[in-house]
Amino acid sequence: MVLSVIPVLYAANTTDFSSFGLGVLTDTISCEVTEERNGVFECLLKYPVSGQHYGLITKECIIKAKPNDTAADQAFRIYRITKPLNGIVTIYGQHISYDLANVPVLPFSTEGRSPQLILSQLLAGDTRFTGWTDYSDAKAFSVAQPKSVRACLGGTEGSMLSKWYGEFEWDNFTVKFHSHRGQKTGVVIEYGKNLTALEQDEDNSGVYTALLPYAVYTPEGTDTETVVTLPEVTLPIVTSEIVRAKTLILDFSDQFGDAAITEEALRAKANSYIKANPLGTTIPTVTVSFEPLWKQPEYSALLERVNLCDTVTIRHSLLGVSVSAMVIETVYDTLAERCKSISLGQSKSSMITTISE
């Protein structure tokens, strides 16, 4: 086994992962890293109780593991270790960025500040972390009550994710907030070529027939909130998938910044939202396993890679599946240095349940 792909164990307070720490976990049976778009980023490792370093593996320790084909090795803090079963324990680790779930942010408010400055301010409570973003447009931002840093980043009303959207990338102690993390790769995963397994799931819970937009603001000189809605109340969403009325109620308050909130402006933003989001159509989630062509000798010159948030094409002629969609989840086999599976479609989780906890 190549030493560079074997997970390494570190003490709980480690911040420099360039050494071999407490030891290289050469007896590791399996190690998988799962990452979701703006969601879960975890490591699952199986290790024998007879392994050389078993006695050193405790909760809060850190495991360094390879998360995908292109990124640097990432640090995962152990939060759960199962009881031995047939002489093997299962070790669960969360990405080191989950430490930010326990770093508090006190209430503050700003009328207009760049996202880079806001990100730096939020991360100031833990000097191990730094932030980067390619967003530049300033917006009003506030924290009304004490929250964790991760809750301020995403998963709660008024978070950075809810204001700028985008996609987070967690690179050890660097928090990267991309406007678009992935790219349109041109990669095709096809039956008869490199597709080994496919599962398609269609969920219409995100399909609606109408959108009811509203926005709330407090007029200058008053303490009373004003709610702006449309005279027609809702805007229609074209769909042929459901016959019953199903309305999406959505708050657009965060989308105005310093601009005046009017019926006309609200209608324009709501129509833009309908146009940009497939609210009237089921977008299937496709989970596939495949053989990376770039790891096969005859295709070694290929520069193709599949990473989280990339757009790829899946084709299976026998099942009639042909879809181009965003990669929303990757499961990576660290020891084999290969992507075990990817999921394409709409985000299956959000930072509401995974970041703000």
Regions found by a protein language model. Name each.
Residues M1-S120, T130:
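Beta-strand-rich assembly/attachment modules of structural machines
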Residues V2-D16, V175-F177, L211-Y214, V312:
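Short polybasic amphipathic segments
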Residues I29-G55, T196-S356:
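An acidic/polar, Gly/Ser/Thr-rich interaction patch typically located in mid-to-C-terminal regions
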Residues H53-N68, A101-E111, G186-L195, L302-D310, ...:
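Extended Gly/Ser/Thr-rich low-complexity repeat segments
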Residues D69, W164, H316-L318:
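Surface-exposed loop/turn motifs at beta-strand-loop junctions within extracellular Ig-like
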Residues L85-I88, Y92-G206, S324:
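Charged- and aromatic-enriched interaction segments used to assemble
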